[in-house]
């Protein structure tokens, strides 16, 4: 036998036995290396101490619950929506116009066409709270105090809180206040009056009440051409009849065609009609024969 072969085979056998012992025994692991500690750089001399950041101040809130920076835009949008609703309601005999200087002030006038206050023309001003629609109800003051149980004889203010004790957002609207101001002249309420004299006369002496109402209407009519109490370009004012100005406008109003008539003329009727005009009987229209 070759001696080199016997030596190599012996060494291989010893190495295999050693590996078996190593596998059969516990697995030896090397001890973990300790990582070097991180050190912060030294603080330079004359360095100022670091102060903790202050917590941000809470966002300012406006009176209507929105962010203060959005408050004016939210209020303007709310008032624009309110005025749009007033226009869509088409309140009979009631006309309003927002002020040029403040959207919180509206000028208006009410025309009474029948009843105890017939022929009355009453100018008024609506004052809207600056925290609308989360505040109280708007105030309505007549330019000239009207003789009425619900109108203060000194200030001319209408008792609006009677109908809107608590203004409810998204439920109450300004057009309802205007409708209420119109309704009080047709349906008289004398409970808890602002003008006790008017309430007593309405209950005890209706003829004297009517006489004072007629006098009040005459006073308002006589002062109809007075300058507005508030100097504003959009304030409602009346002027005497001027033919050079008003005749042309009246003619246009009288000759203006109704929307229904214009719509009917613009509709193209297709096909033939076998119904005689003014009749509902089928085939009542006589057929014209062509001579041959």
Swiss-Prot record:
Organism from which the protein derives: Rattus norvegicus
Membrane topology: Peripheral membrane protein
Taxonomic placement: Eukaryota, Metazoa, Chordata, Craniata, Vertebrata
InterPro entries recorded: Ub_conjugating_enzyme, UBQ-conjugat_E2_core, UBQ-conjugating_enzyme/RWD
MF GO annotations: ubiquitin conjugating enzyme activity
UniProt KW keywords: Apoptosis, Cell membrane, Cytoplasm, Membrane, Phosphoprotein, Protein transport, Transport
Designated name of the protein: AKT-interacting protein
Gene: Aktip
Pfam families assigned: UQ_con
Phosphoserine, modified sites: 30
Paired cysteines (S-S): none
Subcellular location: Cytoplasm; Cell membrane
GO cellular component labels: FHF complex; HOPS complex; nucleus; plasma membrane
Family that this chain belongs to: Belongs to the ubiquitin-conjugating enzyme family. FTS subfamily.
Positions with biased composition (Polar residues): 1-11
PROSITE patterns: UBC_2
Record text on subunit structure and interactions: Component of the FTS/Hook/FHIP complex (FHF complex), composed of AKTIP/FTS, FHIP1B, and one or more members of the Hook family of proteins HOOK1, HOOK2, and HOOK3. Interacts directly with HOOK1, HOOK2 and HOOK3. The FHF complex associates with the homotypic vesicular sorting complex (the HOPS complex). Also interacts with AKT1. May interact with FHIP1A.
Record field: compositional bias (Basic and acidic residues): 14-23
Region (Disordered): 1-64
Function: Component of the FTS/Hook/FHIP complex (FHF complex). The FHF complex may function to promote vesicle trafficking and/or fusion via the homotypic vesicular protein sorting complex (the HOPS complex). Regulates apoptosis by enhancing phosphorylation and activation of AKT1. Increases release of TNFSF6 via the AKT1/GSK3B/NFATC1 signaling cascade. FHF complex promotes the distribution of AP-4 complex to the perinuclear area of the cell.
Record domain UBC core: where: 74-222
